[in-house]
Amino acid sequence: MDALAGLLDGPRAKGAFLLRMIMEPPWSVRVEDGAPLCLMCVTGGEAWVVPGTGAPVLLKPGDIAVVRGPEPYTVADAPGTPPRALAGPGGECTSLDGEPLDQSMRLGVRTWGNAPDGTATVLVGTYRMDGEVGRRLLDALPGLLHLPADTWHCPLMPFLEEEVSRDEPGQSAVLDRVLDLLLISAVRAWFSRPGAEAPAWYRAMGDPVVGRALRLLQNDPAHPWTVASLAAKTGVSRAALARRFTALVGEPPMAYLTGWRLALAADLLRGTDATVESVARQVGYSGAFALSAAFKRVRGLSPQEHRAGA
């Protein structure tokens, strides 16, 4: 599993909140749902995203924005339009006075707004994210990522708009997967921009030697890797691999592997009921004692304390 695949297993959409918003000016929605990640696509008209800090961003048809939470932000027809609705946790929407608006502004299946024929249409998907594997990638993103339509092409956006209002068996799973793919496409396009400040390990994926070594480590962390075995797989000497890996990734191969294993272990400890012994073996440690020692050394707490939320 590479880091982009890890993103799918980190903030992966599992019953994510997905909504088509149809609005006619003036309109403004203050978002205070605490979601760690929100993806917005404009399919008609325009919308402004006004973050808590930083400049407002105008979204036009075909544009996509990814907002990293949990800080509040506003989506509106214009930056200066006062909020008329408040979006809280779980997609609950109220007036500023606390009056529920979910039913009064409901326009159909997963469709909400102030006018059925409004000029602005925005697809909104919010994620729950508990995984550290995905967070390793998301932490490299800006608070507000904006991809204009003329800088990338993704055929998934029209498909998502078509599917969002359907109410058929398995539809939630379909929408979750499409949302996942749209997010991955956006992140990949963002990091591929000229001059993009992608994480070092992401840039290193393009190197024929280090990229192969990274994929080997990520795809099979339980293997008893050594610098020598990695070097043999990549066709270079141990010294050459260690030097090249450290220069491109920013840390030696075994240090990177330790961080990757512990991130995987942290997710398994929080997301499953597997024993510490089982988790240890899944991520490449000989047993619970070895994992506990590494966890304590690197993170300052035991696996049990991490699982308990310490």
Indicate where each model-derived feature is located.
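Short helix-to-turn junction characteristic of helix-turn-helix DNA-binding domains
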Residues: 42, 217-220, 268-269
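Hydrophobic residues on short alpha-helical segments
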Residues: 39, 161, 214, 263-266
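Generic structural signal for alpha-helix termini and adjacent loop/cap motifs
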Residues: 45, 78, 163-166, 192, ...
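Generic protein-terminus/edge-of-domain signal
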Residues: 1-65, 71-114
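Conserved hydrophobic/aromatic beta-strand scaffold that supports enzyme active sites
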Residues: 20, 41, 64-66, 122-126, ...
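An amphipathic alpha-helical interaction segment
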Residues: 120-218, 240
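Glycine-rich phosphate/pyrophosphate-binding loop
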Residues: 117
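Basic/polar phosphate-binding segments, predominantly the helix-turn-helix DNA-binding elements
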Residues: 181, 185-191, 212-263, 278-309
